[in-house]
């Protein structure tokens, strides 16, 4: 029985109630580790006392009671005192009795640090830095006695501090997506607090083709910073739009990373602040997401299906027969894109699913192209220097120059 190993452990190592109870953390319910450790010591003393009554006092049993007393077990200390034997408790072999009597002190440090930030938060995550020698001593016991029911001292510290901080501040513990993260150094008592970013998923539409004098598109970032009283906003987009391309229709996926927010308003209130802002970018369909959504969004870009409208000028006249020929040729056609960087050459295959067009007037053509999200649309139209094969220009046999490009729809 694994709990029977407790006496073997205490014969060799004096342990406080916390550090003994933690070795058997998976046994029993409704007990914290301090209560569990005390209960184990009570049980061991009762077993020893029963044997003394049945067998008489032996050196073995007396030494076991002394081992319990050295581990700070008050009933064992009194038991020996009644026999005229005085035993002083030793320091806990694992924690040195320097951890669990300071929990309230550390809780006050954490609470004061959080309150001094002057920010809104509803959840927190708490971690601790525990000296390596303490962790190694704990590990040596679980290894030596083959204990499989233990939990780590860091886990107990984090849980006990977390419960008390939560009760004092009225905020919840959230391991996955906290508003703030706290780390306490149990050696120094110092506290580090990190304000966690907020991630907002949205769809953006770029309604203006022209850009400002600095060559940049104006996002309503200042409105977002204002809403969250944040330090900054980082923009993560699902793909990139070539310069001068409008994004219409349902818009392109985007995630806004709000850095060090002091306020945490509802996204509906933020959306109301962004409406009719007069910026180049219009944001819709706002929702809170996890940080992992950024990686997932970027990984899906190549699987997007994008519908482009391209207005192009051609060197020669384009006939309806040319349009039909392009339509038939590019239905579900693979296109190879070549990227050169110095001597390195990289090829990427993209799909063109559908191509339609109409002649607006002589040498002015409008194309509707439905293709894979990673297709370089300008290169597909004009062909470049053979960087995209096949291309519209290459198939027609004369120059085709795109002058306007709009994204009409993105299916993700």
UniProtKB/Swiss-Prot annotation:
Protein name, UniProt field: tRNA pseudouridine synthase Pus10
Which reaction does this chain catalyze?
uridine(54) in tRNA = pseudouridine(54) in tRNA; uridine(55) in tRNA = pseudouridine(55) in tRNA
Give the enzyme's main class according to its UniProt record, as a single word.
Answer: isomerase
UniProt cross-references to HAMAP family, sorted A to Z: Pus10_arch (MF_01893)
Give the family this protein belongs to, as stated in its UniProt record. Belongs to the pseudouridine synthase Pus10 family.
Q: Which GO terms describe its molecular function?
A: tRNA binding; tRNA pseudouridine(55) synthase activity
Reported function: Responsible for synthesis of pseudouridine from uracil-54 and uracil-55 in the psi GC loop of transfer RNAs.
Annotated substrate binding lies at 308, 376
User: What Gene3D superfamilies would the database entry show?
Assistant: 3.30.70.2510, 3.30.70.3190
* Key words of the record: Isomerase, RNA-binding, tRNA processing
């Amino acid at each position: 029985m694994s709990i029977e190993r407790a006496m073997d452990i205490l014969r060799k190592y004096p342990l406080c109630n916390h550090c003994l109870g933690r070795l058997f953390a998976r046994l029993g319910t409704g007990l914290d580790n301090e209560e569990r450790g005390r209960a184990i010591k009570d049980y061991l003393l009762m077993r020893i006392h029963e044997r003394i009554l049945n067998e008489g006092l032996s050196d073995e049993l007396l030494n076991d009671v002394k081992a319990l007393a050295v581990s700070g077990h008050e009933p064992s200390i009194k038991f020996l005192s009644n026999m005229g034997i005085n035993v002083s408790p030793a320091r806990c072999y694992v924690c040195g009795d320097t951890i669990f009597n300071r929990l309230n002190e550390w809780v006050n440090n954490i609470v004061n640090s959080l309150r001094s930030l002057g920010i809104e938060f509803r959840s927190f995550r708490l971690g601790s830095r525990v000296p390596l020698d303490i962790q190694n001593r704990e590990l040596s016991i679980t290894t030596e006695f083959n204990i499989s029911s233990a939990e780590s001292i860091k886990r107990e510290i984090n849980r006990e501090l977390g419960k008390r901080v939560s009760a004092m501040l009225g905020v919840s513990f959230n391991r996955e997506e906290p508003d703030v993260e706290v780390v306490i150094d149990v050696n120094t008592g110092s506290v580090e607090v990190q304000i966690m970013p907020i991630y907002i998923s949205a769809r953006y539409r770029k309604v203006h083709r022209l850009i400002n004098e600095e060559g940049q598109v104006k996002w309503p970032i200042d409105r977002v910073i204002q809403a969250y009283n944040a330090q900054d906003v980082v923009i993560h987009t699902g793909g990139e739009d070539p310069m001068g391309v409008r994004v219409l229709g349902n818009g392109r996926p985007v995630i806004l990373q709000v850095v060090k927010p002091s306020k945490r308003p509802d996204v509906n209130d933020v959306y109301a602040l962004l409406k009719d802002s007069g910026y180049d970018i219009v944001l819709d369909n706002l929702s809170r997401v996890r940080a992992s959504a950024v990686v997932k969004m970027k990984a899906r870009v190549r699987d997007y299906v994008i519908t482009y409208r391209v207005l192009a000028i051609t060197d020669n006249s384009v006939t309806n027969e040319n349009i039909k020929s392009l339509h038939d040729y590019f239905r579900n056609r693979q296109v190879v894109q070549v990227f050169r960087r110095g001597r390195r050459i990289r090829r990427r295959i993209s799909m063109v699913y559908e191509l339609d067009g109409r002649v607006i007037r002589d040498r002015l053509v409008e194309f509707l192209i439905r293709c894979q999200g990673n297709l370089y649309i300008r290169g597909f139209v004009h062909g470049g220097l053979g960087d995209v094969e096949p291309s519209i220009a290459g198939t027609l046999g004369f120059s085709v120059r795109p002058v306007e490009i709009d994204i009409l729809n993105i299916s993700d």
